[in-house]
Structures are given as structure tokens and as C-alpha cells.
């Protein structure tokens, strides 16, 4: 049995499969995997995103997912440098080349971008976060598990699923547990939303991690974490409005900063803003105003000296 255009299954020997198979050309980037025996057949495209195209493929007797990363010039992912800050490159020669922006350095940067998702998937599986099982990344093609729903169809994205208030609350709690475990593993998704979560019979599955952020080494981590939590909460809040008043983003991050966050930390969704931070901002504004006033005073004195 193979996937049809709508995500269902059709017999492998049916006339519908023969017609679709004849029309499906093997993408250029997947051809080497076919030549090496890693992929036996490309069944159909599943989706096209801002950083990759995804295909259903057959590997022996298993149907898997092949994510073909787009080249840097064709990716529509904005402000990639903000996400990549803090990613470590062990080889010093590679690191220097990447800093200089040479052709070799750009190639190495691509390798790092493409391997980041693979490494994150393995790390998150070990952290008990539900993500697709990876099988390896080969020349910019990530082979991984194809997530299916309870009826054997390709699992829908969260954005395509309607939820009862009870289910929304339950799944939101699961997602807050997942982002907590991710943060305990040192990672922030960086682009989490209803479009990057699949839903199978067991609940949410997080996908799309090439932009994943190293929490302790990236100056943007807190901002991206807050955005992730707020966006996913806003979606579940469409079905359970009481979730919209929660502040899991601040609660979880404050525990993380204090070194008190654990994978199974008790969470309440209640967080009180630290007003001291606002006072510091006000003080900085005042200091800047004083500095500007002093510069203007000195310039005025210089003007008087020139005129005198």
C-alpha cells in the first residue's frame, strides 16, 4: 500500500498507483540516495516550505519522509544569523572559514544548518519530546519517520485540526511539558506554531527544527522562547480562551535562568513581571538623556570659544 494524493493509502498494484508513479519524477537531490539504495521509491510530495521540500519515500518495506533542504540562496527563512548565534563548530579551520564567509566557509555553514535538525531530533528523543524518528542526513536530505494519524493517513498539522476545549487544554499542557523538556536539554525551537506541530492519535508531534536555538549561548533565546510559547498558546486559546491569560513563557524562562527548571517541573502558568527590569530601563533612558544634554553643553561651549 502507498500514499495517494490526499494522504490516504492505495494498493501498490492499482492503476491509480501506476499512473501517479509514472508522473512522479525523482527530485535531483534525492537521486543519489536512490543510487545508493537508501531510498527505493519517491512516492509523492508532501509539502513545500520556506527552508525545505518534503516527500514521502519508500525505504524497503517502510514509508518514510525525505526532507530536502533548499540551498541558502533559495531559502526564505529570515534573519538566520539570529538563530545560528552560539552554535559551536568544533573544527577551528571550519569556524574561521565560516567567520570569513569564504566559499568553503559558506559550504561549511550549509553543513551545520543541515545537520542541526538531525542532532536536535536525536537530542529531543532522548529528552522524551515527541518528534519524528530520524534515520540520517545525506547530502542535504534528512530521512525520518513519516507521522501518521490513527487511520493511517499522513498526520495533519495542528492548524488543520479542530479541538474541543478539553482537548485543547490537554494538548496545551503536553506542549508546555515539551518546551520545558526542550529547554532543559538546552534547546529552543525558535519557530514554534500551529504550523510546525503534527497531531497523531497520541497527541502533538513537534517538527521543523533546522533553526533550533542553543538556549545558553544565544542572546535572542529568551525572546524566541517567549514568542514560541505565546504563539502556540494563542492557537490553543482559540478553543480554550482561559489559556490566553497564562504566562508559561515567563514562568518557565525564569526557572531556567535561576537554574531551577527540571523536565517535570510543576507549572502553574502564573508569572509576575519583575518590575526592577522596567526601573533599569528607565534609568538607562535617563542616563542617555543626561549624556546627550552634556554633549550639547560641550558643543555649545566650543561654539562660544570659536566665536570668542
What are these regions (language model features)?
Residues 1-48, 60, 166, 170, ...:
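Regulatory N- and C-terminal appendages and interdomain linkers associated
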Residues 60-71, 154-161, 165, 193-238:
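Catalytic activation segment of kinase domains across protein kinase-like and atypical kinase folds
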Residues 184-194:
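Catalytic-loop of the protein kinase fold
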Residues 2, 7-13, 18-154, 180, ...:
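Conserved ATP-binding subdomain of kinase catalytic cores across diverse folds
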Residues 107-110, 161-168:
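Short, surface-exposed loop/turn motifs that are enriched in glycine and acidic residues
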Residues 140, 196-199, 248-255:
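A glycine-rich phosphate-binding loop feature that marks nucleotide/adenosyl-phosphate handling sites
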Amino acid at each position: 500500500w502507498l500514499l495517494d494524493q490526499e494522504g490516504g493509502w492505495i494498493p501498490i498494484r492499482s492503476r491509480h498507483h501506476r499512473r501517479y508513479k509514472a508522473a512522479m519524477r525523482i527530485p535531483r537531490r534525492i537521486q543519489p540516495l536512490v543510487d545508493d539504495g537508501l531510498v527505493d521509491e519517491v512516492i509523492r510530495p508532501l509539502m513545500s516550505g520556506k527552508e525545505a521540500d518534503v516527500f514521502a519515500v519508500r525505504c524497503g518495506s517502510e514509508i518514510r519522509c525525505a526532507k530536502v533542504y533548499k540551498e541558502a540562496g533559495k531559502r526564505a527563512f529570515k534573519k538566520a544569523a539570529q538563530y545560528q548565534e552560539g552554535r559551536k563548530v568544533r573544527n577551528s579551520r571550519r569556524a574561521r572559514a565560516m567567520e570569513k564567509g569564504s566559499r568553503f566557509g559558506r559550504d561549511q555553514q550549509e553543513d551545520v544548518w543541515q545537520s542541526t535538525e538531525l542532532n536536535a531530533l536525536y537530542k529531543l528523543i532522548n529528552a522524551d519530546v515527541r518528534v519524528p524518528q530520524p534515520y540520517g542526513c545525506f547530502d542535504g536530505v534528512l530521512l525520518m519517520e513519516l507521522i501518521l494519524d490513527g487511520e493511517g493517513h499522513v498526520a495533519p498539522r495542528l492548524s488543520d485540526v479542530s479541538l474541543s476545549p478539553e482537548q485543547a487544554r490537554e494538548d496545551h499542557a503536553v506542549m508546555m511539558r515539551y518546551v520545558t523538556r526542550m529547554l532543559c536539554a538546552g534547546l529552543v525551537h525558535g519557530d514554534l506554531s500551529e504550523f510546525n506541530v503534527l497531531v497523531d492519535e497520541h497527541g502533538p508531534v513537534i517538527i521543523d527544527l533546522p533553526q533550533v536555538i542553543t538556549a545558553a549561548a544565544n542572546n535572542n533565546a529568551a525572546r524566541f522562547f517567549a514568542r514560541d510559547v505565546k504563539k502556540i498558546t494563542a492557537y490553543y486559546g482559540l478553543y480554550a480562551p482561559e489559556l490566553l491569560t497564562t504566562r508559561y513563557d515567563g514562568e518557565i524562562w525564569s526557572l531556567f535562568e535561576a537554574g531551577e527548571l527540571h523536565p517535570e517541573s510543576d507549572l502553574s502558568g502564573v508569572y509576575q513581571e519583575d518590575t526592577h527590569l522596567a526601573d533599569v530601563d528607565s534609568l538607562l533612558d535617563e542616563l542617555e538623556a543626561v549624556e546627550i544634554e552634556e554633549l550639547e553643553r560641550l558643543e555649545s561651549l566650543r561654539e562660544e570659544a570659536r566665536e570668542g
